[in-house]
Amino acid sequence: MKAALWYQKGDIRVEEIESGPPGPGQVKVKIKVCGICGSDLHEYREGPFIIPRKPHPITHRQGGPVILGHEFSGEVVALGEGVTQFAPGDRVVVNPLIYCGECHYCRLGQHIMCTKLGTVGFAADGAFAEYGVFYEYSLLRLPASVSDEMGAFVEPLAVAVHAVKRSRMKIGASVAIVGAGPIGLLVMQACLAAGAGKVFVVEPMKARRKISSETGAAAVINPTETNPGKEIAKLTEGLRSDLAFDCVGNQPAFDTAVKITGRRAVICVVGLSLKPIEVPFIRLWGHEKEVTFSSGYEDEFPAAISYLADHRVKVEKLISASIGLDKLVEKGIIPLIEAGEKHVKILVYP
C-alpha cells in the first residue's frame, strides 16, 4: 500500500509498504480522508515532537519511520481474532489515544492523563496511508448523516468539546475565542452548540475572520486595528466576556485573553506554547480569574459525532483544499507552514 512515512525533521516520504492483516482485537480500516493537524506540521519542522524519542512503553516505537495522521475516517475491511463489535463495511473514526488502562488515571477514566500515553500517528502508525490497523476499542461508528469529510473533523471537534467541558461554561455565557484556526473555529461552534450566549472572535487573518462570521460569531475583531478589550467591553455593557479560550498558545494571545475577560472570568488555554508565558499575577488575583488548560479529549468523541450528525457544528467552510497522498508535503504541509493565512484545514485522500 501507499503510505507517508516520517523519517526525521523535514523528511516525509510517500512509499509503497506492506499492508499487514489485523492481529487479535484489531480492525483493518481503509482510510477515506485524513486531515493535516498542526502537530503534523510540528513533526515536519522540528520533530520528533510528539513522536517518541525513546521506545514507547506500550507500542515500543521510537522515532521514524512512522506513518503520521490521526484526524481521519475510514471503512472496516477486515477483522482480527476476537473482534465482535464491528463488521466489514462499517464506516468508522478512531480515537487515537493509546493508554495502559492500568495506571491511577486510566482507572478513573482520565485516559488523556495516562502515565504511558501515546497517540496513533506518532507512537503507532497513523492514517496518511491507504490502510491502517487499529484496536477495536478505539473505533466509533459514523452515522449515514456524517460524510467521510465530516468524519475527518471528529477528532479535532472532540478537542473542542473537551475544551468546553474543561472551561465549565455556563449556558448563556458570553464567550471570546482568541485565534480562529481549525481548533478555534471548532471551539466557537462547540460553545454555541452547548448553549453559549454571544461568542466573539479575535483573529488578525481576514479569511479566518470571514469564516468566523459565517459560522456563528456575534462579532469578529481584528486585533491589529481595534483594541479587543475595549471592543468586547462595548459589546457586553462594560463587563467583558465571562469566558475566553486561548486557541493560539503564545504570549500575545494569552495577554489578549486576560484583557477581554471580566472579573471572576475563566480563561481556558487550548493552544500549545513551546516557550514560557508570563502571567499577570496581580490582575488575575485581584479579579479572581481562573486559568485552566485543555490538552486533548477523553470521552468526547460521541458528542462530536452527534454535533456533526445533526448539523449543530458545520465544517464545510473550514476545508481549504483537498489533495492526494502523493502531494502531502508540497501541497499540504508546506502551504500550511508558509501560507497559513490562506488555509484552515487541508484534507488528504489516500
Predicted regions and their residues:
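Glycine-rich beta-strand-centered segment in the early N-terminal region that forms part
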Residues: G20-C34, F49-H104, P143-S145
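Short glycine-centered segments of the SAM/dcSAM-binding site in methyltransferase folds
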Residues: R91, S174, A265-V266, E290
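Adenosine-nucleotide cofactor-binding segment
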Residues: S174-A180, L192-T256
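C-terminal hydrophobic helical "lid"/dimerization subdomain
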Residues: L243, Q251, D255-K259, E298, ...
